[in-house]
């Protein structure tokens, strides 16, 4: 029996990591302020290249290893960044040079795997996962620190979750992205999947039959002034407390509000050749995981599924999921609950990041076929979503979105069949379609050749982009046009 597969397109063209896969080690100097002078890296790295003459790229500074999130303090205007192993750094000037001063360490907050950070006024919120059960289990954890001049940051616990099982894969995404509601009343928190595509991940039998649970694959909404909450691994209790905002999202590693206060999230999909979604996230909606990703049905939900890359071109024989036999016949895979409706992803109209695998198995370009996809080229890992909320850019970019792609086709066996491109900055020109009650996006590459970009912030008409590196990372300043007239685009998919 053939595997069911459908591309959920909303229209024909007429007119968005796995996170890092090891828990961090403790810092050796937890309570001691550390400063590191910005320096030019001795490591051979790419220099980002603008793809337009009216966009400039310059090095802002080097940063500590394993940088993940970049922040701007809303009150002071100072830059801060966080690292995967628990550090929070304040960027200051010392003797004319930019300096990274460590102000918070793992010992201060107890988050072994620090992935999320956001400011709400002078309150810095941090989220991630703790280690439990001799590194076989975990809890989600959200804390906040008051960051004010000359005062030691003091921590308040917002929530801890009930403990649940880790797994032995790179797919345990954890609690990782934060966003503050425009009215300042809530913190939105993403908890990614603990599986690749909904399969059993029991950590070699420690957690029998464990798949995803009530605390994963969701975006939560928590009152900004909440303290010492205990979130249970119980879907009914979480819904009764109104903590769950949206469900069925594999891993929304970044979220952002647009100028109209719509919440969007960018998501990375599984090792199957699903496109990478960008969702317009609305309260009470379900976005398909684990049954649909990138507009493509997950074949493992069907009892007759027998994974064979020779028969199913959406399966890559060299993928982690195939090599580890996580794609498997799975007759006990959960069924779609009766009456459950899925909300589709934002539809990409191109001209960039819109390559996809068609029903025939061939790689196609939406520009040539007239098909919109949900939303970005497969395996590209969209991160660092931002919008021009202050409407300071030129007419061409005013109020628009921007997103990074962390993966590059030349270095990814999964992405390379689709494109050699990636690790770039995309301009997102979004428009609402009333008929489908969804958004369409025109996507254009504007800066190329980042090293390992993970996050971005906007200040004035400049984007600041931070890169993750095991030895030395970087922050780049991308200056966008603010008062120039709209320019004609020439060509496509260059760089």
How would you label these PLM feature ranges?
Residues 1-9:
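Bacterial N-terminal signal peptides that target proteins for export
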Residues 10-18:
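Bacterial N-terminal signal peptides
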Residues 17-28:
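Bacterial Sec-dependent signal peptides at the C-terminal "C-region" and cleavage site
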Residues 26-197, 378-435, 462-480:
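Acidic, Gly/Ser/Thr-rich repeat motifs that build Ca2+-stabilized beta-propeller blades
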Residues 29-50, 193-243, 250-251, 255-442, ...:
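Beta-propeller domain segments
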Residues 62, 71, 109, 169-172, ...:
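Short, glycine/acidic-rich beta->alpha junctions
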Residues 400, 444, 452-458, 462-465:
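C-terminal target-recognition/interaction regions appended to catalytic cores
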Residues 477-495:
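Extracellular/periplasmic ectodomains of large secreted or surface enzymes and adhesion receptors
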């Amino acid at each position: 029996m053939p595997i069911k597969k459908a591309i959920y397109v909303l229209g024909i063209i007429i007119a968005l990591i796995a996170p890092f896969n090891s828990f961090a080690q403790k810092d050796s100097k937890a309570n001691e302020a550390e400063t590191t002078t910005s320096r030019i890296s001795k490591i051979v790295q790419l220099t980002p290249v603008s793809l337009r003459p009216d966009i400039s790229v310059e090095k802002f500074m080097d940063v500590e290893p394993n940088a993940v999130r970049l922040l701007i303090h809303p009150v002071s205007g100072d830059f801060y960044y966080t690292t995967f192993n628990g550090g929070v750094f304040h960027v200051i000037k010392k003797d004319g040079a930019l300096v990274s001063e460590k102000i918070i360490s793992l010992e201060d907050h107890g988050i072994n795997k620090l992935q999320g950070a956001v400011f709400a006024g002078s309150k810095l919120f941090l989220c991630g996962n703790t280690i439990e059960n001799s590194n076989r289990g975990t809890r989600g954890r959200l804390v906040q620190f008051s960051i004010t001049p000359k005062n030691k940051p003091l921590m308040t616990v917002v929530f801890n979750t009930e403990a649940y099982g880790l797994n032995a894969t790179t797919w345990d995404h954890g609690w990782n992205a934060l966003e503050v509601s425009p009215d300042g009343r809530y913190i939105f928190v993403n908890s990614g999947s603990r599986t690749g595509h909904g399969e059993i991940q029991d950590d070699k039998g420690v957690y029998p039959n464990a798949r995803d649970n009530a605390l994963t694959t969701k975006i939560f909404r928590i009152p900004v002034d909440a303290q010492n909450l205990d979130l249970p691994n119980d879907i009914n209790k979480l819904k009764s407390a109104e903590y769950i905002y949206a469900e069925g999202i594999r891993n929304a590693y970044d979220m952002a509000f647009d100028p109209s206060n719509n919440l969007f999230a960018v998501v990375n999909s599984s090792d199957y050749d699903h496109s990478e979604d960008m969702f317009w996230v609305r309260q009470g909606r379900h976005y398909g995981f684990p049954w649909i990703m990138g507009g493509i049905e997950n074949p493992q939900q069907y009892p007759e599924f027998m994974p064979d890359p020779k028969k199913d071109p959406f399966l890559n024989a060299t993928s982690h999921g195939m090599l580890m036999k996580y794609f498997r016949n799975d007759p006990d895979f959960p069924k779609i609950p009766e009456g459950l409706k899925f909300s589709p992803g934002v539809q990409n109209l191109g001209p960039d990041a819109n390559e996809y695998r068609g029903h025939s198995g061939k790689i196609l370009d939406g520009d040539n076929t007239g098909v919109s996809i949900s939303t970005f080229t497969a395996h590209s890992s969209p991160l660092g979503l931002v919008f021009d909320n202050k409407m300071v850019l030129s007419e061409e970019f005013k109020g628009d979105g921007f997103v990074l792609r962390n993966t590059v086709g030349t270095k990814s066996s999964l992405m390379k069949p689709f494109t050699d491109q990636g690790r770039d900055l995309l301009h997102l020109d979004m428009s609402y379609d009333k008929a489908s009650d969804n958004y369409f996006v025109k996507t254009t590459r504007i800066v190329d050749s980042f090293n390992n970009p993970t996050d971005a912030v906007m200040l004035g008409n400049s984007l600041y982009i931070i890169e993750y590196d095991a030895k030395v990372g970087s922050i780049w300043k991308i200056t966008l046009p603010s008062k120039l007239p709209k320019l004609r685009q020439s060509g496509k998919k260059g760089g």
